[in-house]
Structure formats: C-alpha cells, structure tokens
Amino acid sequence: MRALFSSPAADTAGQQEALAVPLARLRFAAPLAALLGVMHTLAFAPNRWWWLQILSLAGLAALVRQAPRLRDVAWVGYAFGLGWFLSGIWWLYISMHVYGDMPAWMAAAAVLLFSAYLALHPALAAWLWQRLARGRQLSGAASALVFGAAWLVSEWLRGTEWTGFPWLNGGYAHTDGPLAGYAPLVGVYGVVAIAATLAGLLCAAAERRLHWLAGLAGVAVLAAGWPLHTIAWTQPVGKPITVRLLQGNVPQDVKFQQTGIDHSLALYTKMVTEQPAQLVVTPETAFPILLQDMPQEIALAIRTYVDTTGSSVLFGAANADSAVDYTNSAFGVGPWFKGVYRYDKHHLVPFGEFIPFGFHWFVHMMNMPLGDFRRGLPVQPPMPVAGQRVAPNICYEDLFGEEIAASLRQAERPATMLANVTNLAWFGDTIALDQHLQISRMRALESGRPMLRATNTGATAVVRPDGSVQARLPVFTLGTLQADVQGMQGLTPFVRTGNAPALGAGVLVLLAALARRRRAGAA
C-alpha cells in the first residue's frame, strides 16, 4: 500500500526520505480514496448495501494509515469526501440549474464548492485519528475505537455547524442492516460510530494487528443488532387510524406560476374531499398560496368535508402573520379540536427559507420563490386525530433526529406518530427521493413511531416503527396512498437522552487517546 504514496526509489532510500515524499506522490492514493468515497455513496438508498459502507471506510482507514505525513492523511480524507459528496448530492445541480435558471457552469461550481466544504469533515476525522493514534503503539482495537470516535465527532459537526447538513450520514446506510437495531438506543450518530469502529477493526485485521478477542467482540457487536431490532421499545396505543397520503405530482417548473397554482388548488381540493379517512395529509405547500389568500370556496369545501365525514385534514401552505412575517406551515382541521391546528417549520433551509448574510447575490441568480421565513418554536403540540397525536415535520426537518427526539420528550403528551410533508420535485427523479425516504426510516427507528410521508412527487410512504416500509407510491405519479396505521406510545432510550451518550462516549475516547499521547511524549 505504501507504494501508492512513494516511488520504489524512495523506499530504497530509507524511512527518512519516505517521510519527505511531496504531495504530488499522492497521485494514486487520492483517486483511490475518491473512488472509495463513491463506493460509500453506493451503500445508501436506493441500494441496501450496508456492508459497503463499512468496507469503504475500512479501505479509507487502510489508505490513511499508509500516508507518510499528517498533511497527506488529511488530503486522503479530503479526496474520500469529494468522491462521497459529489456522487451523493449532485442532484442539487438540478434545483439550481433546471428549476432555478442558474447558468449551468455556476450551478456546477456551487455543487463542487459545497462538496468541497463538506469534504473537510472526513479530512478532519482522518487527521484527528492519526494525530492521536500514529506512532503510539496502540492496539488494533484501541486504534479502531479512536477512528470511530473521530468519525462520530466529524459527522456531528457536519450535522450541526452553520445550521447543519447531515445528509448522507453513514448511519443511514444501515436502516436495512444489523446495526439498525442500535438506532433506538443511540440514534444515527451512535450507529455511524459503531460502523466506523467496525471498519477500523476490519482494517486492523487485514493488517494483522488485531487480537482475535477484539475481532470476536466486533463480530458480536454486529450480530447483536439483529436481536436488538426485535425489541419493542414502544407500545401500541389506541386503535389504528385510516390515513390517506396525497401525491399530486405537480411539475415544479409550473407549481408557483399562476397556471400551476390554479391546477394545485383544484387538484388537492378534489383529492382531499374524494373519500373519507380519519386523516388526510397533503405534501408541503400543496396549496401554493398564503393561507390568508385561500379561496373561500376551497376553505368551505374542506370544512364541509370534515364536518360531514368526521375526517381530519393536515395540509401544507405558507402563512403570513404580517406583511414581513412569513412561515412555512402545515395546517389542520378536524372534529377533534376547535379552530385550525398550525405547525410552523422550525429548522429552515439555508438559501431556500432564509438567506445567510452576504449571499443575497447568490439567491438573486436563481428564479425561485425564495425568501426569509420566520422559524417556528422548537417544541410544538401535535395534532389530535381519533385518539392519536400526529407530530408534523416539514421537508428536511426530519434530518435532525435530535430535534424530533427533543420535541417528543419535552411534550406534555408526546405524539404517537410522525408525519413528514415535503416537496422534492426540486431535485427531479433522482436518488434524492430514495435518500430522503431512508432518512425518514431512521427517524421511525429512533423514535419507535410510524412515519407518514406525503410528498409532491415521491417517495410518499408509510413507515413502520421498526423502519420498514409498510406501503409506498411509485415516484412521479399522481396517486393516493391509503393505509391503516397504529400509533405508539413510550420513549425509546434515544428519545430520552438524545445524542448526548454517543457524543459523550466519542469525546471521552478522544480525550483518553490524547492523554495517552501526552504521557508517552512526556516519557
């Protein structure tokens, strides 16, 4: 493996010259690391190759260990990140160029720059691991633990800094694997820490640095996920309710034009009132107008439907509390409460729902209905429906499992089911739709609750509390998904504690490695 970083002549010149290999000698290692990053992306939906996530990280660990200098270590991690994110979030180009009318070169440059920023995090993880573990005679198992902790901290930083972008967190690749059993215990960050540690063990085993007991422990941790997955951390409450999830398949390029607005208003009014159900859910901004501008005949049709059938309706629309105070909201009407239920989106999308300081010029390059919205409260009451309590979240809010967990544990009466309303038409018929469904499946696993997904173009689905998909509609089709859904009560260990145990354990491992390094240096 060292040949990837140095020439044969450098090897014969001895260890000292090998450490002085210039950055140009990474010409083989960096592309290989980028290829491993692409392999990492392939582990995610629509594939179910959870094992590839571990293998690709093990390959990265092997490359990193052979890098002669710490700066080379960081470059290898960075190349891995570029391959990972360019292959995993390329669909952002579609929203900016196809629907935002941004010049192709500028949209491509924006995706490249964003991926370059995200790639700093695996570079940090690789550098931190080797900074603490290199040359300290750590056992293979101890080194693997430090790798897992470094990867955990870097992923947590990516998911929190600058409002966070935790898309493609490695833990999501394991919704169909044995490590899914750990999600109700430690959440997605705990899962990715376990996966990275297993990758470190695999790397150590390949290099014959792993004691057989440590290898056996790794196999046991992996295998234990299956029986953990069978544990019911939450319990059924009340009777199942009949839900209808609407998928209007309204083209994004006309959705906010007058013809598209008229089409959406007529379409969703018809779909909502077609037949009774205890709960009907529309996608995000299904009614692409302000609630205050809702035509009276549509409001009357929905109210009449609710009053005559006993159904409840949760629908998406924007709201204006004043001329400068807008929210992206979900509204509910039903027989189980007075007035209109309202949920305001709390975690807003940068550039889509708020514009970071200094970036108005960038937004002006796109022909999109973007602006600054006000964020909702972090904890909002669920919507009561036929003995159940439904907690909405809007668009990519379901990427933030800690926020959903906090809303459940801090609520007076926690929700018994979750509902994600979204519009991913911005990203075309791409892997983004399957990736987002996989994220919702992880939220169901973490919370022990069903997740209802009503989307404009897909993937509209019902997810069981164990993360499996109960039913779904084909993407980019017009349709209604009807299912009976059982609400769940009780709090999983992850909901009770959030990310604190996993993150705390990772920080402790890094501090222990740092203390050992300082003691060794003092000696």
From Swiss-Prot:
One of its GO terms (biological process) is lipoprotein biosynthetic process. It is a multi-pass membrane protein. Pathway: Protein modification; lipoprotein biosynthesis (N-acyl transfer). The chain crosses the membrane at residues 26-46, 49-66, 74-94, 109-129, 137-157, 185-205, 212-232, 494-514. Gene3D superfamilies: Carbon-nitrogen hydrolase. The keyword Transmembrane helix applies. It comes from the Bacteria. Residues 246-487 form the CN hydrolase domain. The keyword Nucleotide-binding does not apply. CDD domains: ALP_N-acyl_transferase (cd07571). It holds the Pfam family CN_hydrolase. Keywords: Acyltransferase, Cell inner membrane, Cell membrane, Membrane, Transferase, Transmembrane, Transmembrane helix. It is found in: Cell inner membrane. Its EC number is 2.3.1.269. One of its GO terms (cellular component) is plasma membrane. The active site is at residues 284, 345, 395. InterPro entries: Apolipo_AcylTrfase, C-N_Hydrolase, C-N_Hydrolase_sf, LNT_N. Its main location: membrane. NCBIfam families: lnt. Belongs to the CN hydrolase family. Apolipoprotein N-acyltransferase subfamily. HAMAP family: Lnt. This is Apolipoprotein N-acyltransferase. It comes from Ralstonia nicotianae (strain ATCC BAA-1114 / GMI1000).
